[in-house]
Amino acid sequence: MCNPPILDVCCGSRCFYFDKHDSRVLACDIRREEKIIGKNRTCYVNPDELHDFRSLPQDWENRFSAVLFDPPHFTHAGEKSWLRAKYGALEKDTWRDTLSRGFREGLRVLKPHGVMVFKWNEYNIPLEDVLACAPVRPLLGAETPKTSLTHFVVFAKDGATKARDGLCILRPQRIKDFCALPFAWQGQYDVVVFEPPMLSAPGWTPGAWQNDLTLALAECFRILRMNGSLIFTWKESEVPLEAILKCTPEKPVIGNRLPTKAKRHFLFFMKLPDDGVSQKQWELF
């Protein structure tokens, strides 16, 4: 893809990608290297372009429909450790400034009403302290229990919070209410947030929840504008991720690959023209 609509400002080894060679994403990092740790571990960091997320090119302003921001989260990692090789590391005295600059730059290169998907692990630094570095309030976050340290948080440029801002948040009590949205909504939204009800809630077709979810997700894509973002979050962690992927009309860009640990599925999609990619090509586990 000549002009990818999604920018990953610090791709690392692309751990949360469903396709590590996704042409929809311009993957950047400050380093390009291959490290062998011990006898059996090899870490590849091979971005499309080398950039520092604290200072992105000036001519990228308002260029991207979505930004992925998964910065290093360790402040204590050995110089030759596997953790530093795979995830990188922040300086314990300057991490606030580093993340603040990263947030500002990520939002700067977003188009109006674009979204930034931020991923964080609280191994060393609490999420609350990290969010204090952001210049805007988050739009939403994937709730996780105390046993999970990983969080997905979504920011919208220009503080989009309402339908007039191109935002649609859908949390229906009955899935059937979501399978046939108003026709006039077609192509109206830049961002759709979809959180289906639990399978124990009324309204699901007995024994056919995948059909219901397929119809609902198709409606989500229908009401999106081209290059619009779909945020899918669902508490049904007992449902295998593979089963959900069979219901999606397009391949996800990134997501929570281990929902049983976080007790919630989180997937990020973007509406694009059909790229001819079959399901078997992108279900990479």
Which positions does each model-derived feature cover?
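Class I S-adenosyl-L-methionine-dependent methyltransferase catalytic core
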Residues: 1-285
